[in-house]
């Protein structure tokens, strides 16, 4: 069995930045209220005619490719983790065409805020079983298009962005995707969802119904309790399986959901604040993009060193949560 490792990463965010003061002009809130409860100071929002998640995914992917001077034709598989596709049938194929990866298979993966973790795990399986050599994974979301901007419980939280990574086959002894642990509790799906709702009247004599997707709905208190209880347990279970302790970990990278969640999880694990990778204050909750966006920024800032052990954990809608432990090789 061959190994797998991340060899490059890139990210992209929209140009438009909306700070808390501007949000307070839309709904009844304030910068102090938002920062105190979430840690978010500003977020990026995608605007413009015909702009979609594909544009952000393309930009992030090209940055990851350009950093290592890789030809897109070398990519065998593209996995786009998104919950806000440009096309309900999937947007990965559009990314494939846009970057010129004509030889790659492409598909979407929908797991909301856990999407990038599942993309890493899925790509690693394809590589370790010998199916593919070079896989491009992308976490990208434009949840601003699915927000009720009159609902202050949700509109203050989310931003748009994309992050991409290239995972490549390597010798088994050089494997850097060390282990993973995944979970789902579908009984709690209503706590964070974008549900489809049918009209309550039929359109014709055949009793056929049509409807539409609703805005983001979230029970914040329940999501907090879920994350703070489940995520530390997932991380410990994953580390134990690898015979690693929390002291062996150089960096903790959690889905950038909320400052209180990040701090509570770190406290439960007894992780020092200086080991937490976070850019939540600048971008808000970017769903599947949040982990690669923070990882790329940490790398660009020389925060991460080669051979560092990074614990990555995503959690959110589904409810789904999971952990992957990697060794940094870039």
From Swiss-Prot:
The active site is at 113, 255, 285. Residues 256-260 are annotated as: ACP-binding. It catalyses: malonyl-[ACP] + acetyl-CoA + H(+) = 3-oxobutanoyl-[ACP] + CO2 + CoA. Pathway: Lipid metabolism; fatty acid biosynthesis. One of its GO terms (molecular function) is beta-ketoacyl-acyl-carrier-protein synthase III activity. SUPFAM superfamilies: Thiolase-like. Its EC number is 2.3.1.180. It is found in: Plastid, Chloroplast. GO terms for cellular component: chloroplast. It is an enzyme of class 2 (transferase). One of its GO terms (biological process) is fatty acid biosynthetic process. InterPro entries: ACP_syn_III_C, ACP_syn_III_N, FabH, Thiolase-like. Keywords: Acyltransferase, Chloroplast, Fatty acid biosynthesis, Fatty acid metabolism, Lipid biosynthesis, Lipid metabolism, Multifunctional enzyme, Plastid, Transferase. Catalyzes the condensation reaction of fatty acid synthesis by the addition to an acyl acceptor of two carbons from malonyl-ACP. Catalyzes the first condensation reaction which initiates fatty acid synthesis and may therefore play a role in governing the total rate of fatty acid production. Possesses both acetoacetyl-ACP synthase and acetyl transacylase activities. Its substrate specificity determines the biosynthesis of branched-chain and/or straight-chain of fatty acids. Belongs to the thiolase-like superfamily. FabH family. The last Arg residue of the ACP-binding site is essential for the weak association between ACP/AcpP and FabH. PANTHER family: 3-OXOACYL-[ACYL-CARRIER-PROTEIN] SYNTHASE, BETA-KETOACYL-[ACYL-CARRIER-PROTEIN] SYNTHASE III, CHLOROPLASTIC. HAMAP family: FabH (MF_01815). Homodimer. This is Beta-ketoacyl-[acyl-carrier-protein] synthase III. The lineage of its organism: Eukaryota, Rhodophyta, Florideophyceae, Rhodymeniophycidae, Gracilariales.
């Amino acid at each position: 069995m061959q190994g797998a490792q991340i060899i490059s990463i890139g990210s992209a965010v929209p140009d438009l930045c909306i700070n808390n003061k501007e949000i307070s002009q839309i709904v009844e809130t304030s910068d102090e209220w938002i920062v105190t409860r979430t840690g978010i100071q500003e977020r990026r929002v995608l605007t413009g005619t015909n702009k979609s998640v594909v544009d952000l995914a393309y930009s992030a992917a090209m940055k990851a490719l350009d950093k290592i001077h890789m030809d897109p034709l070398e990519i065998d598989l593209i996995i786009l983790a998104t919950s806000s596709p440009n096309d309900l049938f999937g947007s990965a194929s559009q990314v494939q065409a846009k970057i010129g990866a004509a030889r790659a298979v492409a598909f979407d993966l929908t797991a909301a805020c856990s999407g990038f973790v599942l993309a890493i795990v899925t790509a690693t399986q394809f590589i370790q079983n010998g199916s593919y050599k070079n896989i491009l994974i992308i976490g990208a979301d434009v949840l601003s298009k699915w927000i009720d901007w009159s609902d202050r419980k949700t509109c203050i939280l989310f931003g748009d962005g994309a992050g991409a990574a290239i995972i490549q086959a390597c010798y088994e002894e050089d494997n850097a995707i060390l282990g993973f642990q995944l979970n789902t509790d579908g009984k709690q799906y209503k706590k964070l969802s974008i549900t489809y709702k049918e009209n309550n009247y039929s359109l014709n004599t055949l009793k056929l119904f049509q409807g539409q997707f609703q805005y983001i709905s979230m029970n914040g208190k329940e999501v907090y309790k879920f994350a703070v209880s489940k995520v530390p347990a997932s991380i410990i279970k994953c580390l134990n399986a690898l015979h690693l302790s929390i002291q062996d970990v150089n960096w903790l990278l959690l889905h950038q959901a909320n400052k209180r969640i990040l701090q509570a999880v770190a406290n439960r694990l007894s992780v020092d604040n200086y080991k937490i990778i976070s850019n939540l204050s600048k971008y808000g909750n970017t769903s599947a993009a949040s982990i690669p966006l923070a990882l790329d920024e940490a790398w660009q800032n020389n925060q991460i060193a080669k051979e560092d052990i990074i614990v990555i954990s995503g959690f959110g809608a589904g409810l789904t949560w999971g952990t992957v432990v990697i060794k940094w090789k870039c």
